[in-house]
Design a protein with these regions (language model features):
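Hydrophilic extracytoplasmic domains
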Residues: 21-29, 33-36, 40, 94, ...
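Acidic, serine/threonine- and glycine-rich low-complexity intrinsically disordered segments
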Residues: 160-323
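A detector of repeated loop/turn-to-beta-strand junctions in beta-rich toroidal repeat architectures
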Residues: 136, 196, 250-252, 347-351
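Hydrophobic/aromatic beta-strand positions that recur at structurally equivalent sites within the blades
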Residues: 66, 95, 105-107, 142-144, ...
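Repeated scaffold domains used in trafficking and secretory/extracellular systems
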Residues: 33-34, 72-90, 111-131, 165-182, ...
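N-terminal "mature head" segments of proteins
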Residues: 2-135, 157, 375-379, 387-388
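Short beta-strand elements that form the blades of beta-propeller/WD-repeat-like
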Residues: 38-58, 79-97, 102-103, 120-143, ...
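Short coil turn/linker residues within repeat-based beta-strand modules
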Residues: 69-70, 99-101, 109, 146-148, ...
Length: 388
């Protein structure tokens, strides 16, 4: 009986040993998953790209996640030059310059890299200038550099209604604003050959380009391009085209509202020479003028209010000589500006200035410190308000 007990004990210990060894082997073969929190815990993400530090060529990218409570997380990379930011669900992308690998942030633990699909374009030198979330997937505006001189070549890559990733025909315009409405992608861009700004749309069902000629005999620069309460809204500043010297052109800014289906439009001239910022708020259009007024219009172009901004922190964004203003982002009731020091510095990358989108009063100033003691001057910066 004692012998049987010993045999049973040995058998049990052997089984336990085999289980432990097996678990050890399984654990060794299984790669560790990086632990980390969701990047959407932060309120903002900013990218900073510098070609020189301390006066020497040393390209570097910095991606900084920041919250209104001053919590920050920084990533630096000297191999991949990336900057244009885009949010897709719970991930953040930093698109590369000139065909390098782009950066993908899925958690606070780090980032991975990815490349555009090979063989899609004639050239491997390309830059994603603009990205937006479409109905069927990501929409990307891509600039192609094939060595052509004096010619702009852009393309739009999107997912068609039949769920195929599609690349548009070549567009000889530098696209800088776009919006998807139904199965059309409307966009504005600059035609260098014609020296004019244009509004066009891409039909996703046929992959055909269509030019909207409302501005063919005018000379305007589209400061902003919005989709508000079912209408396309273009905010226009005067532009002196070299081909329109003998044509009398308006000297003030204007606002146009257009039906996206019929392309019927109406415009109103504004009592200001230039609009410096514009955004949608509660189905209205907000316009910030160069002479420090905040104008609010309906999509039917009726003036709702006119507020003076002179002397406010928001107005000072455009006149501050210590910092360079790089733009404003709007999302819901938040407006955020990004500024960087005008000269090389060893203390900070820049500041995120958080405003109330309704009143444009300053809520928070978030300083992003420079993490190493080196002379830094920003050559490119982008800011994204993270959507929760």
């Amino acid at each position: 009986m004692i012998k049987n007990m010993k045999k049973s004990r040995i058998l049990i210990l052997s089984i336990i040993g085999i289980i432990v060894i097996s678990l050890g082997i399984l654990s060794w073969n299984k790669p560790d998953k990086k632990a980390g929190e969701d990047v959407t815990k932060y309120d903002y993400v900013a990218s900073f790209y510098s070609i020189h530090q301390n006066g020497k060529m040393n390209p570097q990218t910095k991606i900084v996640f920041a919250s209104s409570d001053q919590e920050q997380l920084e990533f630096s990379d000297k191999v991949y030059t990336a900057g244009r930011l885009f949010q897709e669900g719970n991930t953040v992308l930093a698109y590369s310059f000139s065909g390098n690998k782009s950066l993908l942030f899925e958690s606070t633990s780090g980032y991975s890299t990815f490349s555009m699909a090979e063989g899609v374009f004639e050239s491997t030198i390309y830059t994603v200038k603009l990205a937006l979330n479409g109905t069927n997937g990501r929409i990307e505006v891509i600039n192609i550099d094939d060595g052509s001189v004096g010619e702009i070549r852009d393309m739009i890559r999107y997912t068609s209604p039949d769920h195929k990733v599609t690349t548009s025909p070549v567009i000889h315009s530098s696209i800088y604003r776009a919006v998807e409405i139904g199965t059309r992608i409307y966009f504005v861009g600059y035609d260098m050959v014609q020296d004019q700004y244009e509004l066009s749309y891409l039909d996703e069902e046929t992959n055909e380009l269509h030019y909207v000629d409302n501005w063919h005999y005018t000379s305007v620069n589209f400061e902003e391009f919005l989709y508000v309460d079912g209408k396309i809204v273009t905010v226009e500043n005067p532009y002196n085209s070299r081909f329109m010297k003998n044509i009398t052109l308006p000297e003030t800014a204007s606002l146009t509202s257009m039906d996206p289906d019929t392309l019927e439009s109406k415009s109103v001239s504004l009592d200001t020479k230039r609009i410096i910022s514009a955004y949608a708020y509660n189905d209205h259009i907000r316009l910030v003028t160069v002479d420090n007024h905040l104008l609010e219009y309906t999509v039917d172009l009726e003036l709702v209010s006119d507020k003076v901004l002179s002397g406010t922190d928001f107005a000072n964004l455009f006149t501050n000589t210590d910092y360079k203003f790089h733009g404003i982002r709007y999302l819901g009731n938040r407006a955020a500006a990004i500024v960087t020091p005008n000269t090389e510095t060893t203390t900070e990358l820049g500041k995120i200035l958080e405003f109330d989108a309704d009143t444009l009063t300053l809520q928070k100033s978030i300083t992003i410190p420079l993490s190493e003691n080196t002379g830094w001057k920003t050559d490119f910066v982008d800011l994204l308000i993270i959507e929760k």
